[in-house]
């Protein structure tokens, strides 16, 4: 990581609002954006496009090393551009998710993608969205944020999103799913979900997105002086 490129990391559990916060911060700061949660799906999609064996580390490592991907904040969405093509919709397909699970299980591929993620830290600055950005990927980042919210609030937000899409979902089932995922993420052996020691912990449970952005920007500006 170049010492001339400021890095802002935003970690936290699923549903805390990391994606929205990172998109807005990248726009306001004029920084590049890294959505680490999508990176394995992007690699899997590149492998599918190029006919690369999803279980061959020898074939996947060079692809991961030179992965041509950009994350662009546009409107209310983050567009994912792979080799010049908008693949945002393709990334959400079940086939892509299944392929991502295969490539994520390969240690050398994970190492190559770690290096590729670190290479995003170039130019005017970077906002990195993930779960271990401040602890593993960018431990020397200038500004680290851990965005949290209660499991109940995260379930409520997700419930509202799904209802707006016309989907019939049960709140209790969503809450249970989020609590189980939290437990897995916080207790896994490799890179457990936790705030970096020098991170600002922001609890968004009772805050609006504007309030979260305002607090985050004040903190970032104090760190990037």
UniProtKB/Swiss-Prot annotation:
Entry-linked CDD domains: CMPK
Compartments it resides in: Cytoplasm
A Gene Ontology biological process term: nucleobase-containing small molecule interconversion
Catalyzed reactions: CMP + ATP = CDP + ADP; dCMP + ATP = dCDP + ADP
Keyword line: ATP-binding, Cytoplasm, Kinase, Nucleotide-binding, Transferase
Gene Ontology CC terms, in alphabetical order: cytosol
Binding site for ATP: 12-20
InterPro entries in UniProt: Cytidylate_kin, Cytidylate_kinase_dom, P-loop_NTPase
UniProt key word Methyltransferase: no
Major location category of this protein: cytoplasm
GO molecular function: (d)CMP kinase activity; ATP binding; CMP kinase activity; dCMP kinase activity
EC number: 2.7.4.25
Superkingdom: Bacteria
Gene3D superfamilies recorded: P-loop containing nucleotide triphosphate hydrolases (3.40.50.300)
Family: Belongs to the cytidylate kinase family. Type 1 subfamily.
HAMAP family xrefs: Cytidyl_kinase_type1
Name of this protein: Cytidylate kinase
């Amino acid at each position: 990581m170049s010492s001339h490129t400021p890095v802002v990391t935003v970690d936290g559990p699923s549903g805390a609002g990391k994606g929205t916060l990172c998109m807005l911060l990248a726009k306001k700061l004029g920084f590049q954006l890294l959505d680490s949660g999508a990176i394995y799906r992007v690699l899997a999609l590149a492998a599918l496009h190029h006919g690369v064996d999803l279980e061959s580390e020898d074939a996947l490592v060079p692809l991961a090393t030179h992965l041509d991907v950009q994350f662009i904040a546009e409107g209310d969405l983050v567009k994912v551009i792979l080799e010049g093509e908008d693949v945002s919709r393709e990334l959400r397909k079940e086939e892509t998710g299944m392929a991502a699970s295969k490539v994520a299980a390969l240690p050398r591929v994970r190492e190559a993608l770690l290096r590729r993620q670190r290479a995003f830290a170039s130019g005017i600055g970077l906002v990195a969205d993930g779960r271990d950005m401040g602890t593993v990927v960018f431990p020397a980042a200038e500004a680290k944020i851990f965005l949290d919210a209660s499991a109940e609030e995260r379930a409520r937000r997700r419930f509202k999103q799904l209802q707006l899409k016309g989907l019939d979902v049960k709140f209790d089932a969503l809450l249970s799913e989020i609590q189980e995922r939290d437990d897995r993420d916080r207790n896994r052996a490799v890179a457990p979900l936790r705030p970096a020691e020098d991170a600002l912990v922001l609890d968004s449970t009772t805050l609006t997105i504007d309030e979260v952005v305002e607090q985050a920007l004040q903190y970032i500006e104090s760190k990037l002086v």
